[in-house]
Swiss-Prot record:
Gene3D superfamilies: 3.40.50.12230. The keyword Transferase applies. Keywords: Protein biosynthesis, Transferase. This is Methionyl-tRNA formyltransferase. The gene is fmt.
Amino acid sequence: MKVIFAGTPDFAAAALKAVAAAGFEIPLVLTQPDRPKGRGMQLTAPPVKQAALELGLRVAQPEKLRNNAEALQMLKEVEADVMVVAAYGLILPQEVLDTPKHGCLNIHASLLPRWRGAAPIQRAIEAGDAETGVCIMQMDIGLDTGDVVSEHRYAIQPTDTANEVHDALMEIGAAAVVADLQQLQSKGRLNAVKQPEEGVTYAQKLSKEEARIDWSESADIIERKIRAFNPVPAAWVEYQGKPMKIRRAEVVAQQGTAGEVLSCSADGLVVACGESALKITELQPAGGRRMNIAAFAAGRSIEAGAKL
């Protein structure tokens, strides 16, 4: 069975490797163009391209698929049975969705229809959801509105960051899409069910500004945001005129004026919130490395009563 693969980041690269390891023929891999990255802004290949080249697969990196006759012709010439799409980052027009014999399967990191859109992992944590998961979806022209082929649940742990949930769902998604491809190969079809009309929510793209901590919010809300925005865009506060990223914190039963430092020791930096307080245990000063609070407190003095 011929499988075109389309994806860009690590989440997708894991799925590509799993599909290849399962023995499916992959005549073409689509990924986004190389982009400048890092402090040196060096042109860097996306993880899917790196994985594809290691596997000896053909790679194409079109800037867009919409109104791109050359890319469409390339896809048609492959005569693929199905396309697997995972965090590709480009819009697939209807003519692309229709090109493979069995259409396009998307690996989506939420329990649809909850958290359609760009940042489902982060929004699930931010909202305090007890669970999330992966859906393999038959793509249509809408935003994550296609019929669901399979659903795989994951319990969000109280200390899970977006990075940790991402890594768990990455493995779940890779295994899930392989299982569905194997079913398609053996039965010639997939049983997909329509998404419920109720329970639809949208996971809007993250912004740096929304990650700025508002101490007037409750400690529970802020703690969830810290985990949801870890590693990027990273929850932050202004400290000595510069942004300081907050990486880990826990809720403590203390009270004070919102934004007031209640204590600072090797055990944690305690800051009052609109309700209860947060004990910050790991942070990252502007231009510096991540550090635990003991290392931070050893070189700096933040007095009780100071404002963050």
